[in-house]
Amino acid sequence: GQESLAVAGNIFLGQTEAPLLVKGYLNKMNKSEYFLLMTGGMATVAGSVLAAYIGFLGGDDPIQRIEVAKNLIIASVMAAPGAIVISKLMFPQTEKVDKNIEISSEVTGTNLLSAINNGTRDGIKMAVNVGAMLLVFLALIALVNGVFYQIAEVFGLNDWIQQNTIYEAFSLELILGYLFAPLMWLIGVATEDITLMGQLLGVKLAASEFVAYIELASLKDIGSAVHLTYQKSVIMATIMLCGFANFASIGIQIGGIGILAPGKSKLLTEIGFKAMIAGTLVSLLSATFVGMLLG
């Protein structure tokens, strides 16, 4: 149905583009279906950004680029069924599913030109909303980090942090990073790498997977002063970071999906944070399976 179509689309489409595949069904979908829609978006990445990630991690080495591309594609494909499993465990389908949905020609368009017009209009409205929500969430994260920095500066913590960690100051990323270090141990990461892996997950959640992959590119370089000890950790990190699950994405999805189904905006805000958690669990599940196979 519409759920499987959206999840399948999320493998290579973005978290705001995939919902366009099921635009005509959005107003009739229930809470469990919306949760899967959002989780699928959080657990995967858009094909348009895969090239950037390959560039970050593969550098100028064509063989390394191929290996990174394989890992990223594997992560995206694994995330689709994982999103279904995790989302239905967190929000089981208890409501009646409407299987008799009629889609008006106003939604799909009466002809080719009408469909192009509708798609262009929806795309522009979505882009504006997504841009606004992303700007607000990134600004909020910057505000929190600014407050943390000033507090740490009073107690002289920033200098100590700069000398002893990969961070320059006390921040939300640092807190989340060390908070998730025990979780990295639970999914099978080597003890030597759990702190760095936890920091990568923290950066992904607080900032974005883009920033986390840039940091991973540095941490995978054995010539760096601070780097991951094992190649297995590098591969697991590549899989774990392959998803849009972060705080900014909550706003992106609320803005993107909300413009397509204005009546569901309240529901989107209610389940947005939980969808981010679910998307993170999907990525961790994929990384765990890959770690088991690597031994």
At which residue positions do the language-model features occur?
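Transmembrane helical segments that form the transport core of multi-pass membrane transport proteins
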Residues: 124-221
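Small-residue-enriched core segments of transmembrane alpha-helices in multipass membrane transport
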Residues: 41, 72-85, 157-181, 273-281
